[in-house]
């Protein structure tokens, strides 16, 4: 049994301070306790060992308690944020235990309490948060039938930094996609026994925290949510069909409030999300399209990194949300594109550039508001909030010139009206450039509080008093080099050099002796010292009290601050979209109620930004042309063409302009991709199993309004199995799903599909051979490709020439055999077919030799017998003529 899990009787054996620590630790099991002692946060026992390992701290042992040495590790209080950030990144939670009692008046250990708990999903401090990423805490409540099988899952997730709360209720098989979209930092689940849990969260759920089952009670959750939102019922939020989502919301709010140690004053609204509201993007699609993260796990180059020229971090975070939540309703996208068009067509002084210049002066008031609601806002948060509000009139004046041309801009303009009472309060109360921390003083503006001003005057007039006293004492004592000074250790003093001490008056009292001087204090100086130091301490205490009262006074303005923050984020993102459209030559797409996708001269937005020249291509998918069979060489651009089609469609529905000459879209409900594959070792699935699982999801869920991207389906198994599966899948997509499909393949047998299904069409990526090499044209043309150029691509990849030669010879053999008679399916364990070995062994295979003309054999033999280093110039010239004659022989042309 560890010392931290000691029983009550064991605790009594410890020192009073350790008893206090163990009681606090018992209330926070599984959490590192940062226990404040003076200027340090200390960790003890197992916590100390763990923190020393994770944070690379020195582990020490000091003294003993209950007969055991006390293991300790500590971090300075002024640098605690950097340690918290590292621990949270590692998925740890930390309880911050502060001294709340006065050491001077405490009997026994100073009173301490946990003031907040920092967990991966409840971050609000600027030092712990990524500027451009939201952090979500999510709770998951599972409903079961009588047999214990999960039937539905209620989700509630909260961005504590902004106060945004959302709910959803899904089928169990939809949860993985939802978690991929939300990306929660921490997930709350019921702490149920392992044998009673019939369903466990997916592996991408984030840091798991188990809480008591009763936290998820649906009735209690409903009441807790009503209390939080200050409403009598929840029907007004469009959530009448939910059940277990209420339980998830209750557990979420209970946990979040407990970690903060106070009410969540900024959580005042609720949004219920339904699957039908957004274009469906499964986890594979989000990864393959590289919306916010590359396949290598980096943030650039991605669609988000290309689009993110936002001037505020609020706009950057909203961009990520929009990319992962493209609305199905085209009216939303059209409204955004109308706003972008109005900004691009605005008169000078009111367009994209001027608005973006004004937006650069805006602070992250969304997160400032969150900290204000939790009473953790720092002085510079308040000055930033004030300065942002002061800058709004200029921004609104520019916006007024274009807002009549777009309903979205008019709505944003109206939402940018700052709360004037809040602005005036901040103007009066907060210093122009306040200190970083309240404890440093200089936070409250002069003129706001008469008592504080008086105390400051006493403290700040010390300099003049000391100058006057020094002048008087020099005249009184006749000591010309006498000095009156102050330091934090000894306070105020009069310094006299050792050679002048005989002139010191009787009322001087020695305070400190130095090597070459003596320091004294007089009754007058002592009286002033008491008054000045007392005034400084009282001023800091008064300022702390005023600051706390100011935070309370600002709480009623939180809804207004949230309204302004939301409008600023949207305006910033629309302006960024406008800047991207202009800089990258993008156009506004159009929408139609009729099914189809028409893209003229479309480009891949991310790839185009990485290369000097990009070949644009058309894509036409209509009710009469549902499936495009795409053939062509590897590296020819098939995957790029497919991805760019999906990205252009996604951008259109997000509300951005798109990289094309023209683009038109009908309704799209989901986008599926089956591009590339890797095995899932953790899940025990092979590459082919992953491929088939993704294909199954598409075949089961795709509708006539879905866009499907299929790349090289069936390649993970034997040739005929793969071909048969690819053929059947393509047929099913046409005959049953009826979805818009881009189907890339190397199975040329599939190019016969349009003969059976007129809704299928062949296109190919062009390439031309140059010697034994290949030049990719990256242009999409009608009709099937005539070959796949696999050997040329292998040569480009650096495959040794000997291997390429052997492959080329064996390819010729296979083609000859295929022309002569049908070839059996290749089998991994069958006896090898006759084939040419490398180098000298190649020539011993008579069947392969028969494919090479005699003159060409003679030419090769002659070349192999030449050592260029032994040739003289004349010999080299004669040899060149000889080789030319051999190559010109009639049967040498092969």
Swiss-Prot record:
Pfam families from the UniProt entry: MutS_I, MutS_II, MutS_III, MutS_IV, MutS_V
Record flagged with keyword ATP-binding: yes
TM region positions: none
Q: Which domain of life is it from?
A: Bacteria
Enumerate the UniProt keywords alphabetically: ATP-binding, DNA damage, DNA repair, DNA-binding, Nucleotide-binding
* Similarity section: Belongs to the DNA mismatch repair MutS family.
Record-annotated residues binding ATP? 632-639
- The UniProt gene name for this protein comes to mutS
Organism source for this protein?
Paraburkholderia xenovorans (strain LB400)
Q: Which InterPro entries match?
A: DNA_mismatch_repair_MutS (IPR005748), DNA_mismatch_repair_MutS-lik_N (IPR007695), DNA_mismatch_repair_MutS/MSH (IPR017261), DNA_mismatch_repair_MutS_C (IPR000432), DNA_mismatch_repair_MutS_clamp (IPR007861), DNA_mismatch_repair_MutS_core (IPR007696), DNA_mismatch_repair_MutS_N (IPR016151), DNA_mismatch_repair_MutS_sf (IPR036187)
One Gene Ontology CC term in the entry: cytosol
A GO molecular-function descriptor: mismatched DNA binding
Q: What is the protein's known function?
A: This protein is involved in the repair of mismatches in DNA. It is possible that it carries out the mismatch recognition step. This protein has a weak ATPase activity.
Protein's UniProt name: DNA mismatch repair protein MutS
Q: Which GO terms of type biological process are on file?
A: mismatch repair
